[in-house]
């Protein structure tokens, strides 16, 4: 019996659909793109259970003719292209004729109500497990309404690997927000249950969408960039050097109004920001590039998430130079202090001042003999310690992180971690962050946050984790957003990951010069920890070099 055989059409369709439709947010993205291509001026999205149970999209676009409707759900059926040459002249978002077919293949049921401007009556279509079950006349309004139910019910393995409903909802909110920014002439609305997560008004500029996406405070801190190249134009908004944010960078890139990932654009922005951002700060940027279709390949990724420019160097230079010019104009950084010429020195130490430190740790955790001596500090990062058996290098940041983590964990377990603020701090969240806050409100309470709704997407923070170093309103806003975004990837260990993040954020940093007393205090606290060997993330805190190893290095043995 042959071991290789040709798959049946249904299996092939489901495999292909899995490349296009990865999660509920993929469905929302594809449906929005279809609505935009249909000339919609208003798009309303409603979801239930993070889009797993229901995704409903209603638009006022051109609608679909009755004879075309069944074809729209067949693979490679499209009105956008006819030949391979058309791929190099594309100006629409959808073009491969795979989206609707893929959605129907991985859903239990899809229902469509649609009507064109010139039709006296609309059409209703129901598909079950990818096959047409019913089609009839319908008295629906102009435009199209699509309901997708039971996503991935026919593919249990894919359903099993979805995140929680709140995390899937956060991803949907991100997609809607991204589309609303670049397609600002269209009004968008996203709701889950009875709650409206996002709403934008149609506008000639993207100012309103930026405010609704990032909040007024963040949007006001952004500066405009503009540039031209051979066959392309770009414009965008980037955060100024003093309005950047903590955490990972947030760079939204659009090519011909399509949200994509572009390594070239991201690298160009990073290069522009070099020297402008303080340690731990990241840029926020929204970049739109309009380029001749023949100069960009949008068919690189199955889900159209990545593009490839024909002349990458020109795009890189244009983005970098435009961002650099805007950053220099918005603020001139203070010149660095004149360099001090000194003899080369590996570490700072004062031999005449010796500090000894008795260690009291459990036998199985013992790192050294009961008495050690602080030699000094190397590279403003490592504390050098000597004992009878050799030397130890202690990573000061990892050590401080371990100390703070165990302190926060102890307070969390005892229920004494919450610290009430003298003045509540108001925080405006993105639609995705609102979804995560609803999901993780209990866990946030466990680690010391007390947060109340304040209207719209604004929230009042009344208490924060004690000993977390959250002193300013800005630091509270930043850390809350950072912790919420941890929930996108670590649902099961959210509380522990949040405590690790708090510990890392407030710890002594690399490059910080410490006095002898500060080093002594740090080591005392470290060796009192339950686990002084590693930081909360698993990196080593202490590296030992024995006397015997040193002698071998220098050929004494």
Curated annotation (Swiss-Prot):
Gene3D superfamilies per UniProt: 3.30.230.10, Histidine kinase-like ATPase, C-terminal domain (3.30.565.10), MutL, C-terminal domain, dimerisation subdomain (3.30.1540.20), MutL, C-terminal domain, regulatory subdomain (3.30.1370.100)
One Gene Ontology cellular component: mismatch repair complex
Keyword line: DNA damage, DNA repair
Top-rank taxon: Archaea
SUPFAM superfamilies registered for this protein in UniProt: ATPase domain of HSP90 chaperone/DNA topoisomerase II/histidine kinase (SSF55874), DNA mismatch repair protein MutL (SSF118116), Ribosomal protein S5 domain 2-like (SSF54211)
Alphabetized GO MF terms: ATP binding; ATP hydrolysis activity; ATP-dependent DNA damage sensor activity; mismatched DNA binding
GO biological process entries: mismatch repair
Cross-referenced InterPro entries: DNA_mismatch_repair_CS, DNA_mismatch_repair_MutL, DNA_mismatch_S5_2-like, HATPase_C_sf, MutL/Mlh/PMS, MutL/Mlh/Pms-like, MutL_C, MutL_C_dimsub
Entry keyword DNA repair: yes
Function, in words: This protein is involved in the repair of mismatches in DNA. It is required for dam-dependent methyl-directed DNA mismatch repair. May act as a 'molecular matchmaker', a protein that promotes the formation of a stable complex between two or more DNA-binding proteins in an ATP-dependent manner without itself being part of a final effector complex.
Protein name, per record: DNA mismatch repair protein MutL
Annotated organism of origin: Methanothrix thermoacetophila (strain DSM 6194 / JCM 14653 / NBRC 101360 / PT) (Methanosaeta thermophila)
